[in-house]
Every structure is written in structure tokens, then in C-alpha cells.
Curated annotation (Swiss-Prot):
Signal peptide: none
Keywords: Alkaloid metabolism, Glycoprotein, Heme, Iron, Membrane, Metal-binding, Monooxygenase, Oxidoreductase, Transmembrane, Transmembrane helix
CDD domains: CYP76-like
Enzyme class, spelled out: oxidoreductase
Name listed for the protein in its UniProt record: Cytochrome P450 monooxygenase 76AD94
Glycosylation site residues: 110
TM stretches of this protein: 7-27
Binding site for heme: 448
Function: Cytochrome P450 monooxygenase participating in the biosynthesis of natural products derived from phenylethylamine, including mescaline, a natural hallucinogen potentially used in psychotherapeutic treatments. Catalyzes the 3-hydroxylation of L-tyrosine to produce L-DOPA. No activity toward tyramine.
UniProt pathway: Aromatic compound metabolism; Alkaloid biosynthesis
Organism: Lophophora williamsii (Peyote)
Length: 506
């Protein structure tokens, strides 16, 4: 074989060898991909999506109820396509338990950010929306250890007692004049003044002022706008246009609330003497600001989060508790009898008395079961493909835990739609994220840091108003006909405020 022919043969052999290897490699990749696809578990079941819009029409005006009804058909772990967003809905305690115990990190580290909370860069400046990161851990530490630590809560026990005493005096005045009490507004004012006194050493409103209702309306606007469905979240091309105007409204609400905080902060910073300390939370925040651990924007948005969560959700839950008791007079009488048995007629209730009142605490738990402070846990985003309950939660999917449905899981709760505090007298279930049929404050690393403060205030306010007053509806309305309709936001408020008449006990 001559040299040119030999070279041609060698090149041809090399070419065919390389071609064969490429084909073989491609074949192996295809086969491996097919095997992987065969091994990968399917998405959770769900209703068939429509072209382009997916399952958006399934949401309805009350998505928590819509999702709970769909879960009865498709199962406790369900997938929907909301526009272009794959959304996984958790609707049972079994699924929630597996999610938090086995997959808390990949399913809780990131958030799906609603377009609305990008207003004013809120999502970058607050712990609620940040991914788990050094910055998030720093915020969590500041909140847990500096602002809402058990030591600080214990030290402000007398402050809570004083605010509840103001509530009592307002209700007593109403009882003497035969006036109705707007229970939600009264509880909101109490919660607002507790936080403002704890944080700023001043009160932002009082029970007879219009300021209280203005704050309540402003906070609800924020809660409603963050919670409501938004087309900009489902169709990325719309996020720049804000078609529903939600982001613009939320930016305006943030500005109004921050303006209040900034007025207080400017006044505090203007104090010339370094010895003028108030020993309150604002002093702590400003010290962290001076040490460059927090920026002023971060302080502003941290306060927005805390005052949102600490006023509206607490007052809404309290209003639901009183509404359930009005509808169930025998339950109210039983709670009042327990208080009388433990404390007698003369002694005013103290926070230290609450552990002696198991039925009262059962009423609070039952209210939190039926009316959780937030309807859904804030939306999470899967970091990677995750196996959950025999299905695949795909990377970047949005995960919504339907707390309203968990509290009505028939596998956990007998007669789940019935208000029955007695169920908690025979079981050791708490609200601290360990029992997955009752997660009113969440679970895992993102559990609500204000849980203990909210629970203490709810029990103390309820005990005080039940100890000193009987309650009735105006115009001799039958309690069974009480309107229990709800309006949707991050929390659920009564559509029609609960206005009832206090009758002072002899």
C-alpha cells in the first residue's frame, strides 16, 4: 500500500472511529435520559389546565376554599398551572409532616416573590421574603433575640396587662352606655398600642380615636393586596405593567406606614443627650443602625412586617374567637364558669392565671384551627426536584401550604367544620409547629417569630372580656344567624365586623 493510500486509510479509520464514538455517546445519553424520565416520579395530580391561562379560573374569590374543594377530588398533594407557574398545593397533615420533617431545606429556603411585594424593594429588605442566607439569618437573629426574645416578652408582662386593662375600661364604658363594641377594632387598637409602646414607648391610637380605624384600614389594605391573586405573578410578561395596580397600591400603603415610623425615628434621633434612653425596641434598632448592622430602609420594612403581622392577624383571630362564642353560648358559659371557679368573683385575671384555664386555652386553639392567622404559609419555591408523598415537586415550583385545609383535615379532626374546643382537652396538641394538623404559625426554620406574643395576647384579652362581661347581639338577633362570611387576604377577616353589646356582670 503506497503512502497516500495508507494515510487516507488511517484518516478514514480515525474518522469512522470518532463518528462511531459520537453516535455511541449520543445513544447512551438518549437511553440514560429515557431511563431517568422513567424513574422520575410524576407530578402530583390536579385539574387539567387550559391553554395559556392554565388553572387560573379555578382560584375564585376565596382560593383557600377552592383549593380545599379541588383537593377532595385530586388528593392532598395537588399540582396546578397558574399561567406559566407550576404550583403545588399541600392540603393535609400527612403531606405537611413529610414536607417539614424530610424536605424543609429544599422546600423552605427560597420564596416565590409576589410582584406586589417588590414595591419599594420590600422583598429585599425584610426577613419574610428573603431566601435563607446570611442576611436572612442576621434578620432572624435580630428579631428572635433582640426584639421578641422570651426574656423581653417576660419583662413586658406588665405592659400587656396595662393594655388589656385599657381594653377592659373601654368595654366597661360601652356597657354602661349600652353601646356596641366593634370587637375587631377594639382588639386591633389593643394590639397596636401594645406594639407601639413596646417598640416606641408611645401609643399610636386610642379606642375612641379615628386614628385606630385609619391604621386598621391601612394594615388591611397591605394584607389584602399581598394576599390577593395577581395576574402579574402568573404571566411574567405582565410584571412590568402591574395590570391590576396592586404593586402601585402597595407602594403607597408602605409609604404611608413608613412615614409614621420615620416621624418617630427622626424625633428619637434628634435627642441630643446620649443618656436619654427609653429601653425599648427602637433603641435596640437604632443601636444596630449606628453599628451598621441594619440600614434605615431595613428598619423601616422590618417595622412594616412586624406591625402588619402583629396587629391584623391577632385582632382578626380574636374577632373570630368571639364570633364563635356568640354562636355557641353554652361554650361561652363553660369558659366563664371555668374562670369563676379558678379565680372567684373579685380577682382580676393575670397572665400567670392562664395555665390554670385549660378550657380557655382550648377555645384559642380551636379558633386557630378553624381560622388560622394566615390562610396559606407564604409561598415557597423548590430549590431542586424534590420527592414528596410519592410525587415530584419540580425545581422552581411554587409551594402553597393551605393552613385552612390542614385545620379541616378529616383524617385528623372529627367533625372538622364544627367549633368544638373540647377536642383539645383530651389530646396534647399545641400550636408551636410540632403537630402538623395545626400549624397556625407555620413550622420549621420559617416559623413565625411573633407566635408567643400573639398567643399570650389572645388568651389574656379573651379571658378578661369573658370574666367581666356577658355578651349579646344588638336588636335581639339570633346568634345562630350571625354572619360568618369572610374576605380573603393573607389573613381572613370577617366581611361584616362583629359588633356586640357587653353586659357588665354584677
Amino acid at each position: 500500500m503506497d503512502s497516500p493510500t495508507l494515510l487516507l486509510f488511517i484518516f478514514a479509520s480515525i474518522f469512522y472511529f470518532i463518528t462511531f464514538q459520537i453516535v455511541k455517546l449520543g445513544f447512551n445519553v438518549v437511553m440514560t435520559s429515557k431511563k431517568t424520565k422513567r424513574r422520575r416520579l410524576p407530578l402530583p395530580p390536579g385539574p387539567k389546565p387550559l391553554p395559556i391561562i392554565g388553572n387560573v379560573l379555578e382560584l375564585g374569590p376565596k382560593p383557600h376554599r377552592s383549593f380545599a374543594n379541588l383537593a377532595k377530588v385530586h388528593g392532598p398533594l395537588m399540582s396546578l398551572r397558574l399561567g406559566s407557574v407550576t404550583t403545588i398545593i399541600v392540603s393535609s397533615s400527612d403531606v405537611a409532616k413529610e414536607m417539614f420533617l424530610k424536605n424543609d431545606q429544599p422546600l423552605s429556603s427560597n420564596r416565590t416573590i409576589p410582584n406586589s411585594v417588590t414595591a419599594g424593594d420590600h422583598h429585599l429588605l425584610t426577613m419574610s421574603w428573603l431566601p435563607v442566607s446570611p442576611k436572612w439569618r442576621s434578620f432572624r437573629k435580630i428579631t428572635t433575640f433582640h426584639l421578641l426574645s422570651p426574656q423581653r416578652l417576660d419583662s413586658c408582662c406588665s405592659l400587656r396587662q396595662a393594655k388589656v386593662q385599657q381594653l377592659f375600661e373601654y368595654v366597661l364604658e360601652c356597657s354602661r352606655t349600652g353601646q356596641t363594641v366593634d370587637i375587631g377594632k377594639a382588639a386591633f387598637t389593643t394590639s397596636l398600642n401594645l406594639l407601639s409602646k413596646l417598640f416606641f414607648s408611645l401609643e399610636l391610637a386610642h379606642h375612641r380615636s379615628s386614628k385606630s380605624q385609619e391604621f386598621k384600614d391601612l394594615i388591611w389594605d397591605i394584607m389584602e393586596d399581598i394576599g390577593k391573586p395577581n395576574y402579574a405573578d402568573y404571566f411574567p410578561c405582565l410584571k412590568y405593567f402591574d395590570p391590576c395596580g396592586i404593586r402601585r397600591r402597595l407602594a403607597n400603603s408602605f409609604e404611608k406606614l413608613i412615614e409614621v415610623f420615620q416621624g418617630i425615628i427622626r424625633q428619637r434621633l434628634s435627642l441630643s443627650s446620649g443618656s436619654d434612653t427609653h429601653n425599648d425596641v427602637l433603641d435596640v434598632l437604632l443601636q444596630l443602625y449606628k453599628q451598621k448592622e441594619l440600614s434605615m430602609d431595613e428598619i423601616n420594612h422590618l417595622l412594616v412586617d412586624i406591625f402588619d403581622a402583629g396587629t391584623d392577624t391577632t385582632s382578626s383571630t380574636f374577632e373570630w374567637a368571639m364570633a364563635e362564642l356568640i354562636k355557641s353560648p353554652k361554650t361561652m358559659e363553660k369558659a366563664q364558669a371555668e374562670i369563676k371557679l379558678v379565680l372567684g368573683k373579685e380577682s382580676h385575671i393575670q397572665e400567670s392565671d392562664i395555665p390554670k384555664l385549660p378550657y380557655l386555652r382550648a377555645i384559642i386553639k380551636e379558633t386557630l384551627r378553624l381560622h388560622p392567622p394566615t390562610v396559606f404559609l407564604l409561598p415557597r419555591k423548590a430549590e431542586t426536584d424534590v420527592e414528596l408523598y410519592g410525587y415530584t415537586v419540580p425545581k422552581n415550583a411554587q409551594i402553597l401550604v393551605n393552613l385552612w385545609a390542614l385545620g379541616r383535615d378529616p383524617k385528623v379532626w372529627e367533625n372538622p367544620d364544627v367549633f368544638l374546643p373540647e377536642r383539645f382537652l383530651t389530646c396534647d396538641i399545641d400550636v408551636k409547629g410540632r403537630d402538623f394538623g395545626l400549624l397556625p404559625f407555620g413550622a420549621g426554620r420559617r416559623i413565625c417569630p411573633g407566635m408567643n406574643l400573639a398567643y399570650r395576647m389572645l388568651t389574656l384579652m379573651l379571658a378578661t372580656l369573658l370574666q367581666s362581661f356577658d355578651w349579646k347581639l344588638p336588636n335581639e338577633l339570633n346568634p345562630r344567624n350571625l354572619d360568618m362570611d369572610e374576605k380573603f387576604g393573607i389573613a381572613l377577616q370577617k366581611t361584616k365586623p362583629l359588633e356586640i353589646i357587653p353586659v357588665c356582670k354584677d
